[in-house]
């Protein structure tokens, strides 16, 4: 089952999309698992280098670790996580709040997380299929939120997991 906080964040994203005339994205158990796994990893694993951003993954789990840098050289590390961790054999795209191993002191909830993404043009574009993302049709959405970390995952493939 999808946790209440994850569901609240996914529903907030879909409500925001509806305000812009966009269809809701089906909420995915698989992508929610990826998102919740990643927020827990971000919260509990220290940054391995200053250049590693919130798309980074530690070596502390059953996944391929990576230091995700601003040049997107490690994009495949993000894209492959749904296939690594779930039955959803699809490319995943992530928006995040929070750095590895850092706690801001702000306890996020769905409205705060969504507001942060709305205030960032690059993240807002992913949610609303604008710019780089205008040709994508999101067919699955997952979310996770723990303390000062939040993730939302998007894929153009439907989740086969019931």
Task: Give residue spans per PLM region.
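Functional surface patches built around histidine and acidic residues
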Residues: 1-162
